[in-house]
Every structure is written in structure tokens, then in C-alpha cells.
């Protein structure tokens, strides 16, 4: 079963923290590093991960009691197509590269990956340098996070359509949405997953 982007961020942080330190992060460390406003959000996502068989809590009411459970799905290589803006739209650069992702992260059909540039989606937990996993599709529902082309330039935003007008809304209260006619916006795909490398290993794209 696919995880939500927020669940993937929590799982990825816990996994990388355990690999680096040999023990699990505290709930407060998860909250601070992933930008959640409250511990309740952390508890909610961890409970969902536990229900789906990704983690388990060894001791109740302990700060560092998380254990990763073995995953029964392998890694899948998908195309890595360059950089997408989480700010002002920029052109996505196609390069001969690929990235391996957990099979459980993928949607049905054609998937690809893009690196985020900018911080307009920061309030959704999407940071500069993150790798987005995108399911290629030409339609989206209101409220979905999409990769879209606006006059040929790629951007990642929240999608809303009212009649013939499309609003691409940032998740950053300091930034303004993009408004355009429907015929000027091409939805490339919807964001179905996110990878974050805390060691900031380069994939060859600046």
C-alpha cells in the first residue's frame, strides 16, 4: 500500500537516523526536523506507519522506542528527469539518470522523479533538494500536489481549477499563487512520494 508524502518523510527520517546513530530518534527530534507544528502530528503518522507494518513501538511511553520492520517490497529504478521549481517556474532539464525508490512508493502506471528547487511548498514539508516521485497523468483533482507546465516551464504546486481558470497555489504564506487559463497549463503528473537524503548526496543536478 502506498504511503502519503508525509508518512514517507517520517519513515525516511526514522530510517536514516537509525542507520546513522544506531537508535531511533525521539518524537521531538522528528517534529523539529520535519517541521511539524505539534507532537500530535508525529504520533498520528507513526501510528499509521505502525498499522501498515513499517515500524513498531517496542516500549510504550518511551522517547526512543521505534524499530523498523522488514519491508517485503524491493527497490524500483525510475527515470530522474532533472529539477522542478517550488517557487518561480523553471525549465525541467531531462538528463540520462535514474533513481531507485521503494516499490511501495509508486503509483500504478508511469512514474518519474524530479529534484525540488525553491521553498514555496515548505509548509507541505517539501524542501529544496528533496526528490519527488511523480505519477505521470494529465488530470488532477483540486487540492492535489502536481507538477505542471506553465508556458513550457515546470513547477510544483497545489492544483485548483474553477471553470477555465487554474490556480497553482504554493504552500508558503509568503508567496503568491499562479493564475492561468486552463489552456495555458499542462498537468504533467501528481506527486505520490518524496525522498530526502540527509547526507545531501548529489544526483548530478544543481
Curated annotation (Swiss-Prot):
Record EC number: 3.4.21.88
Gene3D superfamilies on file: Umud Fragment, subunit A (2.10.109.10), Winged helix-like DNA-binding domain superfamily/Winged helix DNA-binding domain (1.10.10.10)
Record feature DNA-binding region, as residue ranges: 27-47
Catalytic reaction(s) noted: Hydrolysis of Ala-|-Gly bond in repressor LexA
InterPro entries: LexA, LexA-like, LexA/Signal_pep-like_sf, LexA_DNA-bd_dom, LexA_repressor, Peptidase_S24_LexA, Peptidase_S24_S26A/B/C, WH-like_DNA-bd_sf
Biological processes annotated in GO: DNA repair; DNA replication; negative regulation of DNA-templated transcription; proteolysis; SOS response
Catalytic residues as annotated in Swiss-Prot or TrEMBL: 120, 157
Keywords attached to this entry: Autocatalytic cleavage, DNA damage, DNA repair, DNA replication, DNA-binding, Hydrolase, Repressor, SOS response, Transcription, Transcription regulation
HAMAP family per record: LexA (MF_00015)
Subunit structure of this chain's protein: Homodimer.
Stored NCBIfam families: lexA
Family per record: Belongs to the peptidase S24 family.
Record protein name field: LexA repressor
Source organism (scientific name): Syntrophobacter fumaroxidans (strain DSM 10017 / MPOB)
Record gene name: lexA
